[in-house]
Amino acid sequence: LTNLAYSATAPYNCPKSARILADAVKVISNMTFKSSGIANPVLGLAKLAAGITNDELKTYANSICPATGSLQPLVYYDSWTWAYNNIFLSEYFLLTGDTSVTNGIREWTSSLAEAQSMYGTLGHHYTENRHDGTHGSAWGYGPMHACSIPAGISIVLAKKCGIGHPEIDPAIDRLGKNESYYVDKGGLPYGEHAPEL
């Protein structure tokens, strides 16, 4: 592999790129879901990208589907893991059509949409609603783009899966308005900071 050069069209029509990808697929196909945090759903996404949809993947997908009403965001909330679990389940459903995960997608999606701040962002803690019942501010060190973007992507993917919930469209709209502020100003910062240049 070290003696192979990348072709001018790399990664397309490139023997070295093809070899790297084939080797990566071998490694990914042998990995199991033993990690914590976002590592497992990201591994699941890598397996999906490699075309792996075996029983192990189905078992993992079903294992991260929360029962309806089981998420207690005021007690436990992890915006990163929730977002990546939902991205994985949505992509898994879109690729396989396995309806056994739709209730899980619905639960993650509704909880993430309800967790959003009035600006469409997520924080380290679940957003508490204001007295009138509308979304309040992100709290627990403030909002973070680093988890708000994956959560927003997961909500859009869930809608593509046919998941319906009254919070979905407003959540997409809130996040879109927030992120559009950064257009032509620089890259998205980690949290509520000036645009990165």
Tell me what each language-model feature is:
Residues 1-197:
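Preference for long, amphipathic alpha-helical scaffolds in soluble/luminal domains
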